[in-house]
Amino acid sequence: MTDTFWAFVGLVLFLALLVYFEVPEMVLRHLDTRAKRIKDELDEALRLREEAQEVLAEYQRKHAEAEKDAQEIIAAAKREVEAVISEARIKAEEYVKNRNKLAEQKIAQAEADAIRMVSSSAIDLAVSAARVLIEKELDSHKANELIKESLVQESLTKMKTYLN
Protein backbone atom coordinates (compact mmCIF):
# COMPACT_ATOMS: atom_id res chain seq x y z
CA MET A 1 0.00 0.00 0.00
CA THR A 2 1.43 3.04 -1.20
CA ASP A 3 1.26 6.59 -0.09
CA THR A 4 -0.97 7.47 -2.98
CA PHE A 5 -3.48 4.88 -1.91
CA TRP A 6 -3.55 6.25 1.64
CA ALA A 7 -3.88 9.78 0.32
CA PHE A 8 -6.80 8.63 -1.81
CA VAL A 9 -8.44 6.89 1.18
CA GLY A 10 -7.95 10.04 3.29
CA LEU A 11 -9.55 12.11 0.56
CA VAL A 12 -12.54 9.76 0.29
CA LEU A 13 -12.97 9.76 4.09
CA PHE A 14 -12.73 13.54 4.15
CA LEU A 15 -15.36 13.83 1.43
CA ALA A 16 -17.58 11.32 3.25
CA LEU A 17 -17.32 13.39 6.44
CA LEU A 18 -18.21 16.52 4.49
CA VAL A 19 -21.30 14.81 3.06
CA TYR A 20 -22.17 13.35 6.48
CA PHE A 21 -22.09 16.80 8.12
CA GLU A 22 -24.06 18.25 5.15
CA VAL A 23 -21.38 20.74 4.25
CA PRO A 24 -22.27 20.75 0.51
CA GLU A 25 -25.91 21.68 1.35
CA MET A 26 -24.68 24.45 3.66
CA VAL A 27 -22.38 25.75 0.94
CA LEU A 28 -25.21 25.54 -1.61
CA ARG A 29 -27.63 27.30 0.78
CA HIS A 30 -25.05 29.98 1.44
CA LEU A 31 -24.39 30.38 -2.29
CA ASP A 32 -28.15 30.43 -3.03
CA THR A 33 -28.67 33.05 -0.33
CA ARG A 34 -25.82 35.12 -1.68
CA ALA A 35 -27.10 34.73 -5.26
CA LYS A 36 -30.61 35.78 -4.14
CA ARG A 37 -29.18 38.79 -2.28
CA ILE A 38 -27.15 39.81 -5.36
CA LYS A 39 -30.23 39.34 -7.58
CA ASP A 40 -32.32 41.46 -5.17
CA GLU A 41 -29.63 44.15 -5.17
CA LEU A 42 -29.55 44.12 -8.99
CA ASP A 43 -33.35 44.36 -9.12
CA GLU A 44 -33.24 47.24 -6.64
CA ALA A 45 -30.52 48.93 -8.68
CA LEU A 46 -32.62 48.56 -11.85
CA ARG A 47 -35.68 49.92 -10.06
CA LEU A 48 -33.66 52.86 -8.72
CA ARG A 49 -32.22 53.49 -12.18
CA GLU A 50 -35.70 53.53 -13.72
CA GLU A 51 -36.92 55.81 -10.95
CA ALA A 52 -33.93 58.10 -11.48
CA GLN A 53 -34.67 58.21 -15.21
CA GLU A 54 -38.30 59.07 -14.47
CA VAL A 55 -37.21 61.80 -12.07
CA LEU A 56 -34.74 63.10 -14.65
CA ALA A 57 -37.43 63.10 -17.35
CA GLU A 58 -39.82 64.89 -14.98
CA TYR A 59 -37.12 67.43 -14.11
CA GLN A 60 -36.34 68.01 -17.78
CA ARG A 61 -40.04 68.44 -18.55
CA LYS A 62 -40.46 70.88 -15.65
CA HIS A 63 -37.30 72.71 -16.70
CA ALA A 64 -38.59 73.05 -20.26
CA GLU A 65 -41.96 74.18 -18.92
CA ALA A 66 -40.30 76.71 -16.61
CA GLU A 67 -38.17 77.95 -19.51
CA LYS A 68 -41.30 78.35 -21.63
CA ASP A 69 -43.09 80.17 -18.80
CA ALA A 70 -40.09 82.45 -18.32
CA GLN A 71 -40.07 83.27 -22.05
CA GLU A 72 -43.81 84.02 -21.92
CA ILE A 73 -43.33 86.24 -18.87
CA ILE A 74 -40.48 88.09 -20.59
CA ALA A 75 -42.54 88.54 -23.76
CA ALA A 76 -45.53 89.79 -21.73
CA ALA A 77 -43.28 92.19 -19.80
CA LYS A 78 -41.83 93.51 -23.07
CA ARG A 79 -45.33 94.04 -24.47
CA GLU A 80 -46.37 95.79 -21.28
CA VAL A 81 -43.28 98.03 -21.33
CA GLU A 82 -43.95 98.92 -24.97
CA ALA A 83 -47.57 99.73 -24.12
CA VAL A 84 -46.53 101.89 -21.17
CA ILE A 85 -43.94 103.71 -23.30
CA SER A 86 -46.48 104.25 -26.07
CA GLU A 87 -49.07 105.50 -23.60
CA ALA A 88 -46.52 107.81 -21.97
CA ARG A 89 -45.51 109.15 -25.38
CA ILE A 90 -49.16 109.81 -26.29
CA LYS A 91 -49.80 111.51 -22.94
CA ALA A 92 -46.67 113.64 -23.33
CA GLU A 93 -47.76 114.70 -26.82
CA GLU A 94 -51.24 115.53 -25.52
CA TYR A 95 -49.70 117.48 -22.65
CA VAL A 96 -47.52 119.47 -25.05
CA LYS A 97 -50.52 120.13 -27.34
CA ASN A 98 -52.62 121.26 -24.39
CA ARG A 99 -49.83 123.49 -23.09
CA ASN A 100 -49.36 125.01 -26.57
CA LYS A 101 -53.10 125.53 -26.93
CA LEU A 102 -53.27 127.11 -23.47
CA ALA A 103 -50.30 129.35 -24.29
CA GLU A 104 -51.96 130.38 -27.56
CA GLN A 105 -55.19 131.12 -25.70
CA LYS A 106 -53.31 133.20 -23.13
CA ILE A 107 -51.53 135.08 -25.92
CA ALA A 108 -54.84 135.70 -27.71
CA GLN A 109 -56.41 136.84 -24.43
CA ALA A 110 -53.45 139.14 -23.75
CA GLU A 111 -53.75 140.57 -27.28
CA ALA A 112 -57.49 141.12 -26.81
CA ASP A 113 -56.88 142.75 -23.42
CA ALA A 114 -54.18 144.97 -24.91
CA ILE A 115 -56.46 145.98 -27.78
CA ARG A 116 -59.28 146.77 -25.32
CA MET A 117 -56.93 148.79 -23.14
CA VAL A 118 -55.57 150.73 -26.12
CA SER A 119 -59.09 151.28 -27.46
CA SER A 120 -60.32 152.35 -24.06
CA SER A 121 -57.37 154.69 -23.61
CA ALA A 122 -57.88 156.10 -27.11
CA ILE A 123 -61.57 156.61 -26.42
CA ASP A 124 -60.84 158.26 -23.08
CA LEU A 125 -58.23 160.48 -24.71
CA ALA A 126 -60.56 161.39 -27.57
CA VAL A 127 -63.37 162.17 -25.12
CA SER A 128 -61.05 164.29 -22.99
CA ALA A 129 -59.77 166.14 -26.05
CA ALA A 130 -63.30 166.65 -27.31
CA ARG A 131 -64.35 167.90 -23.89
CA VAL A 132 -61.50 170.40 -23.82
CA LEU A 133 -62.32 171.64 -27.33
CA ILE A 134 -66.01 171.82 -26.61
CA GLU A 135 -65.43 173.69 -23.37
CA LYS A 136 -63.36 176.23 -25.23
CA GLU A 137 -65.86 176.59 -28.06
CA LEU A 138 -69.25 176.28 -26.30
CA ASP A 139 -70.87 177.81 -23.33
CA SER A 140 -71.04 175.77 -20.17
CA HIS A 141 -74.71 174.72 -20.43
CA LYS A 142 -74.45 173.48 -24.00
CA ALA A 143 -71.09 171.89 -23.22
CA ASN A 144 -72.53 169.91 -20.31
CA GLU A 145 -75.32 168.54 -22.50
CA LEU A 146 -72.90 167.46 -25.22
CA ILE A 147 -70.54 165.90 -22.68
CA LYS A 148 -73.38 163.93 -21.07
CA GLU A 149 -74.53 162.74 -24.47
CA SER A 150 -71.03 161.73 -25.50
CA LEU A 151 -70.46 159.96 -22.18
CA VAL A 152 -73.62 157.94 -22.72
CA GLN A 153 -72.46 157.07 -26.24
CA GLU A 154 -68.98 156.21 -24.94
CA SER A 155 -70.42 153.97 -22.22
CA LEU A 156 -72.60 152.16 -24.73
CA THR A 157 -69.62 151.66 -27.05
CA LYS A 158 -67.46 150.32 -24.23
CA MET A 159 -70.21 147.94 -23.12
CA LYS A 160 -70.56 146.61 -26.65
CA THR A 161 -66.79 146.13 -26.86
CA TYR A 162 -66.56 144.32 -23.54
CA LEU A 163 -69.59 142.14 -24.21
CA ASN A 164 -68.24 141.04 -27.55
From Swiss-Prot:
<keyword id="KW-0138">CF(0)</keyword>
<comment type="function">
    <text>F(1)F(0) ATP synthase produces ATP from ADP in the presence of a proton or sodium gradient. F-type ATPases consist of two structural domains, F(1) containing the extramembraneous catalytic core and F(0) containing the membrane proton channel, linked together by a central stalk and a peripheral stalk. During catalysis, ATP synthesis in the catalytic domain of F(1) is coupled via a rotary mechanism of the central stalk subunits to proton translocation.</text>
</comment>
<keyword id="KW-0472">Membrane</keyword>
<dbReference type="GO" id="GO:0005886">
    <property type="term" value="C:plasma membrane"/>
</dbReference>
<dbReference type="GO" id="GO:0045259">
    <property type="term" value="C:proton-transporting ATP synthase complex"/>
</dbReference>
<keyword id="KW-0406">Ion transport</keyword>
<dbReference type="InterPro" id="IPR050059">
    <property type="entry name" value="ATP_synthase_B_chain"/>
</dbReference>
<keyword id="KW-0375">Hydrogen ion transport</keyword>
<keyword id="KW-1003">Cell membrane</keyword>
<keyword id="KW-0813">Transport</keyword>
<protein>
    <recommendedName>
        <fullName>ATP synthase subunit b 2</fullName>
    </recommendedName>
</protein>
<keyword id="KW-0066">ATP synthesis</keyword>
<keyword id="KW-0812">Transmembrane</keyword>
<keyword id="KW-1133">Transmembrane helix</keyword>
<dbReference type="Pfam" id="PF00430">
    <property type="entry name" value="ATP-synt_B"/>
</dbReference>
<feature type="transmembrane region" description="Helical">
    <location>
        <begin position="4"/>
        <end position="24"/>
    </location>
</feature>
<keyword id="KW-0997">Cell inner membrane</keyword>
<comment type="similarity">
    <text>Belongs to the ATPase B chain family.</text>
</comment>
<dbReference type="InterPro" id="IPR002146">
    <property type="entry name" value="ATP_synth_b/b'su_bac/chlpt"/>
</dbReference>
<dbReference type="GO" id="GO:0046933">
    <property type="term" value="F:proton-transporting ATP synthase activity, rotational mechanism"/>
</dbReference>
<comment type="subunit">
    <text>F-type ATPases have 2 components, F(1) - the catalytic core - and F(0) - the membrane proton channel. F(1) has five subunits: alpha(3), beta(3), gamma(1), delta(1), epsilon(1). F(0) has three main subunits: a(1), b(2) and c(10-14). The alpha and beta chains form an alternating ring which encloses part of the gamma chain. F(1) is attached to F(0) by a central stalk formed by the gamma and epsilon chains, while a peripheral stalk is formed by the delta and b chains.</text>
</comment>
<comment type="function">
    <text>Component of the F(0) channel, it forms part of the peripheral stalk, linking F(1) to F(0).</text>
</comment>
<dbReference type="GO" id="GO:0046961">
    <property type="term" value="F:proton-transporting ATPase activity, rotational mechanism"/>
</dbReference>
